[in-house]
Amino acid sequence: MPEKLAKAIANPLFPALDNALRSGRHVSSEDLDNHALLIEFERELGMFYRRYNTELIRAPEGFFYLRPRSTSLIGRSVLSEIDMLVGKVLCFLYLSPERLAHEGIFTNQELFDELLVLADEKKLMKFVTHRASGSDLDREKLYDKVKTSLRRLRRIGMLIPIGENGKFRISESVFRFGADVRTGDDVREAQLRLIRDGEAVVHQQEPSQSSLLDGFDADDTGHHDSELTMQEGEV
C-alpha cells in the first residue's frame, strides 16, 4: 500500500468519513476537518475507491461525493422525484439575494412557500391526491412530504440544520441539482426554468432524466425513481 494512502486510512477521521461517503453524503467546505482530509489525500483516496469501481468526485464548487459505476461494489439507491424537486429549489435559494438577506438561514416553511410559488401547484398536488386541486389537508400532506425530503437531503449533506426549529443553512453541495446551468448568463433564471419546466439536470449524469413533475402516478409513497443516484443508505 502506498505510504500516503496508508497515512490517509490511518487518520482517525477516516472511518466515519468513509462510512459517510458510502452512505451517499456530500462533503463540502463547511465540514472543515473531513473536507481538509479529502483535499490533502484526494489522489490517494481516488485510487482507493477505484478498487470498488467507484469514483471520488470533486465538483467545481469544491464538494466531494462518491459516484458508483454500474459494476460498483458499493451499493446505490435513488432519490424520489419530490426529493429532486426540493433539491432544485434549495439550489435556487442558494443563488438568490434572499440568502444574503437571511444570513444564509431559511426555515422549512420558507422553503415550502417558495416551492409553491416556483412550481406548478396542480402538479405538486399529484404527489398527494388525484384531484385537480388540493384541499388544506392535501397541502398539509404535501408539507409533510417536503419535510421528509429535507431530512433526506440533510443526511446526504445538502443542508446544515440550525437548532431545533426547522431552520437550516444551504450547503454548496446543492449544486448537484443545478450543475448544468453553471455556465449560463443568468444561472438563477436558468435554475428557475428547470424547476418550472420540470427538468432534472444533474452534474455529470450520463442518462437523460425524466421530468420531475410529469409522467408519474400520484400515490402516498412519494418514492418515484429518479436517475440522480446516491450510494446505499437512508437517502
Swiss-Prot record:
Pfam families: MukE. GO terms for cellular component: cytoplasm; nucleoid. One of its GO terms (biological process) is cell division. It is found in: Cytoplasm, Nucleoid. Residues 204-235 are annotated as: Disordered. The keyword Cytoplasm applies. Signal peptide: none annotated. Gene3D superfamilies: 1.10.10.2250, MukE-like family, C-terminal domain. Interacts, and probably forms a ternary complex, with MukF and MukB. The complex formation is stimulated by calcium or magnesium. HAMAP family: MukE. Belongs to the MukE family. Involved in chromosome condensation, segregation and cell cycle progression. May participate in facilitating chromosome segregation by condensation DNA from both sides of a centrally located replisome during cell division. Probably acts via its interaction with MukB and MukF. This is Chromosome partition protein MukE. The gene is mukE.
